[in-house]
Amino acid sequence: MRVYLTLFLIIISSINFFAQELNYNIEENISYYPTNESGLTAYQKAQCRLDIYWPTQKKEVPVIIWFHGGGLTGGSKEIPQALKDKGYCIVGVGYRLSPQVKAATSIDDATAAIAWVFKNITRYNGNSKSIFVSGHSAGGYLALMSVMDKSRLKSYDIDANKVAGLIPFSGHTITHFTIREERGIPGEQPIIDKFAPLYYVRKDAPPTLLITGDRELEMLGRYEENAYFFRMMKVAGQEKIEHYEMQGYGHNMTSPAFPLLIDFIEKFKE
């Protein structure tokens, strides 16, 4: 589905003005692994932290967990400016990176962070029944993997279907290229295995909004991956899934995508 600037402006204008009048707090560098847990490395303690930005005067607000991009080799936790002052509780997550660890470890960290949010976010006025998981590029991949593979959150006694929605921005749906490169597989050689969101397509997945750049401008066939994921989810019976293609934008398509994320949250929040 191709989206134009006029649609973005309509969505932006529909945001509740009252949200901009709220006061917000931010708490940084919260460890989402127990700091007294034996076996944690110094690198894990340093990287596996999150920041929370939340409105102080309003309770049970929707929660957005945001995973940064960087190919699973770079980047750092962030709270996107475009999501601030909208009345939401925003969680920016850091995670371990390759080559310090195997890239798949990033998925373990992302899952642990989501579990922490489920169990603690009410302390920050967040609604644990309205948790949305998002991120750009590698962050979109982590969002998908952590939720589509139900066994991951199940290890924390959390049903992945309790996630209110998935909104990956230009995320891999095949096995991530960094994981493939660690195995000696070229980045342009696609595979689908247990490290691919496509491996876990299912009817009962949370509502999902896939957003990619223009098919002629995106990197590494990212549009086509998401289009295939969309189709296979439909084949599996999932009706609450959409795919938007940002015409005229490449991989760095976050700016026009954020209004779509906000509109999606307003549609599916508790």
Where are these regions (language model features)?
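C-terminal catalytic histidine-bearing segment of alpha/beta-hydrolase fold enzymes
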Residues: I211, A227, K234-E270
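The feature captures the conserved acid-bearing segment of alpha/beta-hydrolase catalytic domains
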Residues: D157-G165, G171-F177, E188-A227, R231, ...
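Alpha/beta-hydrolase active-site loop
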Residues: V101-T122
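N-terminal cap/lid segment of alpha/beta-hydrolase-fold proteins
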Residues: Q20-K58
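Short amphipathic alpha-helix adjacent to the substrate-entry channel of hydrolases
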Residues: S76-V93
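Bacterial Sec-dependent N-terminal signal peptides
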Residues: M1-L22
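Primarily recognizes the serine-hydrolase "nucleophile elbow" in alpha/beta-hydrolase
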Residues: A115-E181, I192-D193
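Short beta-strand element of the alpha/beta-hydrolase
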Residues: E60-G69
